[in-house]
């Protein structure tokens, strides 16, 4: 018999039903469960697949550069970044009629094009690219890196080049390599690029390979570096009248601490950014030399963990046993990596709009909205994944003997206290926030808006004031004009910071009021509830009072029959599944809030947000309905326009989202009956019954149907909001 899919599981390959296909897809990446897997092969497969991942990333970024160089308008955009719309790529569509061709021919293009809302134009411009030739060169270089990554991946699957398990478990060497070799050296290299190419570029000097060695990035060269007069590199920065990309008003400084924003581009000073990367580089280069490898100097991580005895014995045996637990569990390591990456991705979302690093990106409102939303959703998926792999660790890798009375075991020992506290916090936030919103809603409905309960966020305003925002009238720290911190700030450090905080033209420290207070607590409700579900899923993954032997059933099981008092819905996978819905809704509230507050800020009518955001009808009517009006007007006498594609996507997103409920609400029995009826009809229909199937059709399992439903819900949700976000913002601001 020929080898059937899946080859990695002979048991599944012999399954006579369509379960073979779906379970095969579901377990394709669960290398641990494959036939003939060894620890060594597991590590080697994952390692080699990383190179494949890198190849895909390099190919994708190469494609971005190539298509903009080929079909975009980068050179025209560089001449006038505020008024030329950046083109992502051309649209070739034989179905376009004349009205559609006209609607999508924008940005000075000869035919229909897509506008770029990703910020790549601003990024490439800021780092010194100026011509299409530059873009083509970058695309070719990344293509070369992509090929190199593929070769490296193939090479590390060859017997001679396969690393051993001991190599993968050498934590100190890996840490040193990642800290110094990847973070440290790449940050230093990036500082070099900024100082040698980007900063001269921002001052009208075009540095390329042909003149790279002739152009001094600083008039005094390396003299100040070797003589210890490093402050000379900060003298004579660009003036506030500097025109970006020209020598007009430019200075000679390369490493500064100006603070605030470049007045024309509304982005951080490039010389501040270079200084930041240099500091990061030095920090990580030092950090990467702290752990003991072949040279016998530095710390052993195991010794560090074993030596740490918590004060007063309140954490039992502290970190004893943790080193081997973490080092021998890929799921634990992946959980830690995903948790870190998730937090970083969310921080990227927050910082890209509040402290924009790329020239002119702050004035491209649609791009700002798209990037914020994109990074917050990505962060949500990554963070839920962290808890999923944490739960798998507890089921597959956790050894109670090895971790007796250490911090990990003690988390499990007092899990009831953790879960009940999270539950209490979620209930408190939910009832109080909803109570305030509903009360205010009723007051508005009865025509007595003055009876709303409006709470000023005084603690948050006090924190903003401490950082220098003066409009609230708190005389504290940096907003206290006669304090030492304020006076030092004017001269020594970040003189531009206080101006930036108090300017209303940027998104730094937005003025907040009762509407912000309410939505902040709604978001806190979502965050705490999502965390509750995820933490409970991981801490109960090994077992609970209801089902003490849960770990023997694996990560995802539907239930253990009707005889145990209801064991459905309690697998660790079910917790992940439920948490994703909460995560999506929470980030929905986050992005609604961000988007509405910024739309009113950009349009100059902040009072609309302030007045309408304190009650539910305000959100539904003045944010969702008002801003989706262009997307739901259907056919009109004006015909096609450039928002039509988003209107279609808005509808299509709703369709995909709604399809999810078909899988989520009706389960296996209904579909099995339906399938058997359809199979009966098929076998008795002339012509149709000439087509046979090798696998007997059966319904999806409960867990699989939930996954398919969840995927539709997530994808539909994000498609719908993406279309709404981009159309409502670009429709207003172009």
UniProtKB/Swiss-Prot annotation:
Q: Which residues bind chlorophyll a B1?
A: 654
- GO cellular component, as recorded: chloroplast thylakoid membrane; photosystem I
Please state where this protein is localized.
Plastid, Chloroplast thylakoid membrane
Task: Give GO terms: molecular function aspect only.
Answer: 4 iron, 4 sulfur cluster binding; chlorophyll binding; electron transfer activity; magnesium ion binding; oxidoreductase activity
Q: Which residues bind chlorophyll a B3?
A: 662, 670
Could you list this entry's UniProt keywords, alphabetically sorted: 4Fe-4S, Chlorophyll, Chloroplast, Chromophore, Electron transport, Iron, Iron-sulfur, Magnesium, Membrane, Metal-binding, Oxidoreductase, Photosynthesis, Photosystem I, Plastid, Thylakoid, Transmembrane, Transmembrane helix, Transport
Q: What class of enzyme is it?
A: oxidoreductase
User: What domain of life is recorded for the organism?
Assistant: Eukaryota
Record-stated family: Belongs to the PsaA/PsaB family.
This one is known as Photosystem I P700 chlorophyll a apoprotein A2
